[in-house]
Structure formats: structure tokens, C-alpha cells
């Protein structure tokens, strides 16, 4: 048994969408074998909910997310060699809380969730030199930024975003390389990410794939689906996240008109917290609902005719895909949206990469309930391998190797 300090960019409860979902289930798996202390940021738009977390770990007082103005971000962009991501959660209050925790207790290891918190590595080294550091990379961030740059360069209206990405790629590569090479062990979410990150890491760097997971049973919806959660099409995710914004706008601009032309009564729910300003007008379009934050995504998945995943940029693996498959949804995705999974096109998911092919796949499923059901059943069977209980042995392997002989 080890004593582990877990650092997360937000409180991992409730486990809803993306980072918090992964972090909660990693915490559950760690707590089965180890003693865990949790230090997190707390988001200003949601109440701190630590009761469930306290059953798994000692929860230190969460730290407020730093408030960075557009002007501050612009100054970093223009004057710093550091990537924007490295400054996003840079906080003197968090640094002080971390240093105090390291001085107060003897930790065998600190597990850092995401590259946004990699700025803490030098502080950990100075404060507690014998403590091992595990860096969990939720994405291959340099590759993600390269993909965004390539995508935006092809669209004149997105050239300001392309300029941002161009400035970030080199900085991110340096920062990511340094973080990888100074950690004692690295975790990635997929073999694809592992290969991309190994191009930056020391060749001898221990790097383990621990996939994204969910509590699969939580997605087997037993009750009635409320009418307000029933839609022909559903997309879920954090709606201030650049890959999600891009995917929704692409679907809305190029695919949705084709679907509505063929089936004028089709409905679409965009389910997720903090809709970006670029998305707000979609809520005024006929047939489209922007829900904002919801208590649970499961009713919307259970009530979906088809789950859509129109992503064109990103890295890692999509937790939203695991969630939708675990719920038994019929899924239409881009190839990139399903990246990192050994899926067979037409068996567990339908892949489509052009507006015409995507719209045709969606329409075919909406018109064929039996096919939707069969596709969803195969998807649910596939998702069973991504239950959170399966990551425990993988985490054990990381820590057994890291702490051997201590």
C-alpha cells in the first residue's frame, strides 16, 4: 500500500463528462489498494461536493480556479515562451496548498492529472525530492494543437484561431517534452497517444496505457425516459471545449441542413455545460435544444434515436463514445471521433467523414429502428471492457514498478 497525493484540475465529483469522469474512476481504483489524499481546484459555477470523495480519500480544501482575463492570456501569448495551457491553472494558492501538503505528510507518489498541472513538477521536486511523480496525460496536447492548426488553416474565417495554434505548437512541444522527461512514470489513454508522446519523451521513460473508463452499469437505464430528454439526435460534452465547439458547428452548418431537408421534424439536443458564445444562437434554430449543464446525461442517452460524434480535431479517446455505447446508443461518428478504439465500422458504430455520408448514415438509422437496436446492443457489449474495475490491475502495475524496493 502506498500513500498517494492526487492532483486534479477540478473536483472529480460528480463524475460528469471528460476529465472529472476519468479522474473519479481512477480515484476509485487507487483507493481500493492505496491511501489517497486529494487536492483539486474548485470551479466557481458549481458547488463543491466532497462527501462522496471523502469516502475514497482525504480531501484537502479545494482551491479556486484562477481567473485569467483575455488580456492576461494575450500577454502570455505575445511575451512568454510558455504555452497558454501551462498558465491556465497556474495558481499561487494551489502551489501553497501543495507545498503545505508535501511538508505535512510523507507521500510515496504524486499523481498529476493532465498537462495543465505539470507546472507543479518542479515544486514537488524541491519540496519532497524522494516523492515519485506520475503524470497522467489525458491527451497528446501537442498533436491536438497541430490538428487544430491544420484544420483552421484551411478556413479563412478561422485564421485567428490558426495563428493562436501556430504560436502554441512549439511551446507546447517544449513544455510537454519537459514534463514527460521529468516525471518518473507516465500514463496515457490510448496506444496512439502513447506513440505520439514517446516521440517527445526519453526512450527509457516508463509509459503505460490506462484507457478511459466508466461505471458501465450506471448507463443501463431502467426507468422511463422523460419527454424532455427524448431527441432524435444527441451530442454530449463540455461545450466550451474547442474540439466539441468545432464538431457541433460543423454538424450544424453542413450536416444538419441535409438531415432536416429529408426529415423536417428531426430534433437534436446538444447536452453539456458552459455552451460557448459561438454556439448560443443554435438554441434558436428549429429543432435544436441547448441544454446547458444537466444533472445526468443518462436520460438523454437513453432517449436518443442516434448519438452523433462529429469530431474533427482532438486526441486521446472520447469518454462520450464509451458513455454512449455503454448506454446502448446507435452511434454515428467521424473516424477521428472513434480513434483509439478497435471498432468495426458498421458493427459497433458507423463511421462517416463527409457531410453527405454522415447525414446519410444518420437518416438511415432514424428510418430503421431494428438496425438501431442491433447496433446499440453490439456497442453495449463492446463498452463492457471499459468498466472502471478493469483499470485497477493496470494502476497496480504502474505503482509496483515505480515503488519497488521502497
Question: What is the meaning of each model-derived region?
Answer:
Residues 320-323, 330-334:
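Short hydrophobic beta-strand element within catalytic cores of glycosyltransferases
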Residues 371-385, 394-397:
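A short, well-ordered alpha-helix in the C-terminal region of glycosyltransferases
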Residues 142, 165-221:
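Donor nucleotide-sugar binding/catalytic pocket of nucleotide-sugar-dependent glycosyltransferases
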Residues 1-62, 103-105:
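N-terminal subdomain of nucleotide-sugar transferases
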Residues 184, 287, 299-316, 327-330:
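Acidic donor-binding loop of glycosyltransferase active sites
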Residues 199, 209-303:
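Conserved catalytic-core segment of nucleotide-activated headgroup transferases in glycan assembly
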Residues 349-356, 364-369:
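Conserved acidic donor-binding segment of nucleotide-sugar-dependent glycosyltransferases
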Residues 9, 70-84, 133-174:
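Acceptor-binding helix/loop patch of EC 2.4 sugar-transfer enzymes
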Amino acid at each position: 500500500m502506498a500513500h498517494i497525493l492526487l492532483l486534479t484540475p477540478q473536483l472529480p465529483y460528480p463524475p460528469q463528462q471528460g476529465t472529472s469522469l476519468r479522474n473519479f474512476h481512477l480515484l476509485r481504483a487507487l483507493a481500493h489498494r492505496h491511501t489517497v489524499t486529494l487536492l483539486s481546484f474548485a470551479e466557481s459555477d458549481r458547488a463543491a461536493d466532497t462527501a462522496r470523495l471523502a469516502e475514497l480519500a482525504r480531501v484537502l480544501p479545494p482551491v479556486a480556479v484562477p481567473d485569467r482575463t483575455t488580456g492576461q492570456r494575450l500577454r502570455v501569448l505575445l511575451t512568454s515562451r510558455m504555452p497558454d495551457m501551462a498558465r491556465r491553472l497556474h495558481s499561487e494558492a494551489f502551489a501553497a496548498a501543495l507545498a503545505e501538503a508535501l511538508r505535512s505528510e510523507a507521500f510515496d507518489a504524486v499523481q498529476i492529472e493532465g498537462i495543465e498541472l505539470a507546472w507543479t513538477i518542479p515544486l514537488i521536486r524541491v519540496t519532497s525530492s524522494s516523492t515519485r511523480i506520475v503524470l497522467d496525460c489525458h491527451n497528446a496536447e501537442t498533436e491536438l494543437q497541430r490538428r487544430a492548426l491544420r484544420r483552421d488553416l484551411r478556413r479563412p474565417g478561422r485564421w485567428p484561431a490558426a495563428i493562436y495554434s501556430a504560436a502554441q505548437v512549439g511551446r507546447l512541444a517544449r513544455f510537454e517534452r519537459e514534463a514527460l522527461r521529468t516525471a518518473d512514470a507516465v500514463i496515457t489513454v490510448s496506444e496512439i497517444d502513447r506513440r505520439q508522446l514517446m516521440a517527445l519523451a526519453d526512450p527509457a521513460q516508463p509509459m503505460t496505457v490506462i484507457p478511459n473508463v466508466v461505471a458501465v452499469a450506471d448507463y443501463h437505464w431502467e426507468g422511463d425516459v422523460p419527454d424532455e430528454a427524448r431527441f432524435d439526435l444527441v451530442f454530449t460534452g463540455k461545450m466550451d471545449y474547442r474540439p466539441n465547439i468545432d464538431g457541433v458547428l460543423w454538424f450544424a452548418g453542413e450536416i444538419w441542413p441535409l438531415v432536416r431537408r429529408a426529415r423536417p421534424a428531426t430534433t437534436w439536443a446538444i447536452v453539456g455545460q458552459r455552451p460557448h458564445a459561438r454556439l448560443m444562437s443554435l438554441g434558436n434554430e428549429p429543432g435544436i435544444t441547448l441544454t446547458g449543464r444537466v444533472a445526468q446525461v443518462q436520460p438523454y442517452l437513453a432517449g436518443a434515436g442516434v448519438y452523433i460524434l462529429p469530431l474533427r480535431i482532438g486526441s486521446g479517446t472520447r469518454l462520450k463514445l464509451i458513455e454512449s455505447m455503454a448506454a446502448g446508443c446507435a452511434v454515428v461518428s467521424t473516424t477521428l471521433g472513434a480513434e483509439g478504439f478497435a471498432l468495426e465500422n458498421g458493427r459497433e458504430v458507423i463511421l462517416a467523414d463527409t457531410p453527405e455520408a454522415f447525414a446519410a448514415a444518420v437518416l438511415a438509422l432514424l428510418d430503421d429502428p431494428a438496425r438501431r437496436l442491433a447496433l446499440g446492443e453490439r456497442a453495449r457489449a463492446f463498452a463492457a471492457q471499459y468498466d472502471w474495475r478493469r483499470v485497477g490491475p493496470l494502476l497496480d502495475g504502474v505503482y509496483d514498478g515505480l515503488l519497488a524496493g521502497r
